[in-house]
């Protein structure tokens, strides 16, 4: 269920401060964050944000299409290795 419009989008303040500082300085280095729950704002467009997936930081280049989505949507946490192959099908 989506968040109530009355409440507005959520973003961690520490991430917002880092993004504002990077935009102000025109800094293009990746911004490390563990905040997968934060919503992507229009200010983020063009920045690279390294989102933690539980094991490492995955670099995410933010585009205009990503605005309104959560950061965690673009850093998958599970690795799919495929189903076990049938031994009879290999022959």
Curated annotation (Swiss-Prot):
Family that this chain belongs to: Belongs to the universal ribosomal protein uS19 family.
Function: Protein S19 forms a complex with S13 that binds strongly to the 16S ribosomal RNA.
Lineage: Bacteria, Pseudomonadati, Pseudomonadota, Gammaproteobacteria, Oceanospirillales
MF GO annotations: rRNA binding; structural constituent of ribosome
Organism encoding this protein: Marinomonas sp. (strain MWYL1)
Presence of keyword Manganese: no
A matching Pfam family: Ribosomal_S19
Any one GO biological process: ribosomal small subunit assembly
Record protein name field: Small ribosomal subunit protein uS19
Disulfide bonds: none
Assigned keywords, A-Z: Ribonucleoprotein, Ribosomal protein, RNA-binding, rRNA-binding
NCBIfam families for this protein: rpsS_bact (TIGR01050)
SUPFAM superfamilies for this protein: Ribosomal protein S19
Keyword Ribonucleoprotein among UniProt keywords: yes
Source superkingdom: Bacteria
One cellular component term from this protein's GO annotations in UniProt: cytoplasm
InterPro entries (UniProt xref): Ribosomal_uS19 (IPR002222), Ribosomal_uS19_bac-type (IPR005732), Ribosomal_uS19_CS (IPR020934), Ribosomal_uS19_SF (IPR023575)
């Amino acid at each position: 269920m989506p968040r109530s419009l009355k409440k507005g989008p959520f973003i961690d303040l520490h991430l917002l401060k880092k993004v504002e500082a990077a935009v102000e300085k025109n800094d293009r280095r990746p911004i490390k964050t563990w905040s997968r729950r934060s919503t992507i704002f229009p200010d983020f467009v063009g920045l690279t944000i390294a989102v933690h997936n539980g094991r490492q930081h995955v670099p995410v280049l933010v585009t205009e299409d990503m605005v309104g989505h959560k950061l965690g949507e673009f850093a998958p946490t599970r690795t799919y290795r495929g189903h076990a192959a049938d031994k009879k099908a290999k022959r």
